[in-house]
């Protein structure tokens, strides 16, 4: 079974990292798929985000990191992945993610989506929030891995 965990990861947060670590324990392997979303201007380009993720996940040998563009369901099809992993922080996430899961299922009936609730220590985190705190010089070391913290401080100085 191949499991896909897609996202923009702009930037990777400790919430993402925790979810990846927990999924690796449950499933034994995971493909982290970094989206190149051409309709948005990311803080970090695709190459930098992949480097941040590789560095932050170097202790997990069963994680594959790839990039993709377009529909997540197409990425899953290309990889022959039959399970998409998504994290849930709050009920509002569930409503949005359920809609996406149903859309993916309508595009490929063999695709299933599994939800993992976020660790309560990270339930408040989002990439947007982290960038906002970093932009104004707030402390982010408890929100992101060290390599991401360094990059954000450099970006916003």
Curated annotation (Swiss-Prot):
Pfam families: CTP_transf_like (PF01467). It comes from the Bacteria. ATP binds at residues 8-9, 16, 87-89, 97, 122-128. Keywords: ATP-binding, Coenzyme A biosynthesis, Cytoplasm, Magnesium, Nucleotide-binding, Nucleotidyltransferase, Transferase. The record marks 16 as: Transition state stabilizer. The keyword Metal-binding does not apply. It catalyses: (R)-4'-phosphopantetheine + ATP + H(+) = 3'-dephospho-CoA + diphosphate. Pathway: Cofactor biosynthesis; coenzyme A biosynthesis; CoA from (R)-pantothenate: step 4/5. Transmembrane segments: none annotated. GO terms for cellular component: cytoplasm. GO terms for biological process: coenzyme A biosynthetic process. Its main location: cytoplasm. Its cofactor is Mg(2+). Belongs to the bacterial CoaD family. Reversibly transfers an adenylyl group from ATP to 4'-phosphopantetheine, yielding dephospho-CoA (dPCoA) and pyrophosphate. This is Phosphopantetheine adenylyltransferase. It comes from Prochlorococcus marinus (strain MIT 9312).
């Amino acid at each position: 079974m191949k499991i896909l965990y897609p996202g923009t990861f702009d930037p990777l947060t400790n919430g993402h990292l925790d979810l990846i670590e927990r999924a690796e324990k449950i499933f034994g392997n995971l493909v982290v798929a970094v989206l190149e979303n051409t309709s948005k201007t990311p803080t970090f380009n695709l190459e930098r985000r992949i480097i941040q993720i590789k560095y932050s996940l170097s202790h997990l040998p069963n994680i594959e990191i790839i990039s993709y563009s377009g529909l997540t369901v197409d990425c899953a099809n290309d990889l022959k992945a039959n399970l998409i992993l998504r994290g849930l922080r709050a009920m509002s996430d569930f409503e949005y993610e359920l809609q996406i899961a149903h859309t993916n299922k309508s595009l490929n009936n063999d695709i299933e989506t599994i939800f993992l609730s976020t660790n309560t220590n990270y339930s408040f985190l989002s990439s947007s929030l982290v960038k906002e705190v970093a932009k104004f010089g707030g402390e982010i070391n408890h929100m992101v891995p060290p390599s991401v913290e360094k990059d954000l401080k450099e970006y916003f100085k």
